[in-house]
Amino acid sequence: MASGKSTMASAKPTTCKEAIRRWEEENQQNAAAATEVILSFQWPPIEKMDNALATLINCEKLSLSTNMIEKIAGIGTLKNLKILSLGRNLIKGFAGLEPLGDTLEELWISYNCIEKMKGIQAMRNLHVLYISNNLVREWNEFARLQELVNLRDLVFVGNPLYESLEVEQWRLEVARRLSSLEKLDGEPIIRTEENPIQLVKTDSPSHDLLQEPV
């Protein structure tokens, strides 16, 4: 048993370069030519995003979910990237995403350690944001989302701010603040001239139903 623990403790994190090599072997494909690359569930987990990711020049969807990444890095040159999946890591903020502000359309970053929303306003083209089960607790942090004029689909369930309100009150507050939003926590928001905000009646959303795919 002791030797097993020692082996785990001494195992080095998987590098992005190694994860890409594994992906190429499994898929019999050159990663630089691929439009979708999945580097999720690495063992030992990836701890650092680095410049090896810059080789994924044609990538439109990149997944690094379920690792132990703390900071976003190494993807600033991926101008074709439209969907980035970083769920189930240890990420605390949005620094590192700024160069993708005009091109990234979907960010899946649920189950991380994000408390402050600083930097999200740089993602001008974002249509979809899955940020459930993080640590956001203040409306003044949430307010940064008001600058994302293209945001249509938001999943925010599981944050302390969400937990502090009844579901119906939460949905009314968000719909009022984000006038372009069409879908919140998996349920549509319907607006008409007579009634600017109509909310589909729903029970408290299931956290499992709102988990984004890999």
PLM feature segments, named:
Residues 7, 97-99, 128-134:
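Short, mixed-charge, low-aromatic patches
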Residues 54, 76, 121, 146, ...:
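Alpha-helix boundary recognition
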Residues 107-162, 171:
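Extended, charged alpha-helical interaction scaffolds
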